[in-house]
From Swiss-Prot:
Record keywords: Cytoplasm, DNA replication inhibitor, DNA-binding
One Gene Ontology cellular component: cytoplasm
Subunit structure and binding partners: Homodimer. Polymerizes to form helical filaments.
Taxonomic lineage: Bacteria, Pseudomonadati, Pseudomonadota, Gammaproteobacteria, Alteromonadales
Family membership noted in the UniProt record: Belongs to the SeqA family.
Region span, Interaction with DNA: 87-88
Descriptive protein name: Negative modulator of initiation of replication
Record GO biological process: negative regulation of DNA-templated DNA replication initiation; regulation of DNA-templated transcription
Annotated Pfam families: SeqA, SeqA_N
HAMAP family registered for this protein in UniProt: SeqA
Organism: Ferrimonas balearica (strain DSM 9799 / CCM 4581 / KCTC 23876 / PAT)
Amino acid sequence: MKYIEIDDELYRYIASNTQQIGESASDILRRLLGLEVTAEAESIPERISEPSMEGVEEAAPVRSAVAEAGVFEELVDDEQLPRQKGAVGRFLYLLDCLYRQHPSAFDGVLAIRGRDRLYFSQSKEALLKASPSANPKQIGASPFWVSANNNTAKKRAILEEVLEILGCQKALAARIAEQV
């Protein structure tokens, strides 16, 4: 017995032509093609590798000792920040650093909202319910999600507000947010 991959449409077609319980795909195809249905001895399929079905080990995000220190000033020259991909990457990285520095106070970010927008949530679904175009992203390994569908200036304003909620001075918050 050989195994082949077929697309969903073909699979549904073959399955819809099943006439009896336990009928194999080979039997169905033989019947549909007008070929002789042969009684084949039950064979045990050999185990094959299915990379798409195997678990993928996700690489642990790079953590900066600077970000772990818990001092806002150290976020200004964090060497890991320039290595992040784009404004969204830097935005998420800084939010993750802040969560790791202040995990117990971080739920204060849930109060940050736009006039008709929800920026933070503890579930992807809540952000999508509030705005289907929110493009929710999880903040590192935290239980928090943020709407990433904002322009860079708005991301900076949101980050600045997060920093101030966590106790950062306004001028320093502006310097850190400017790095997004």
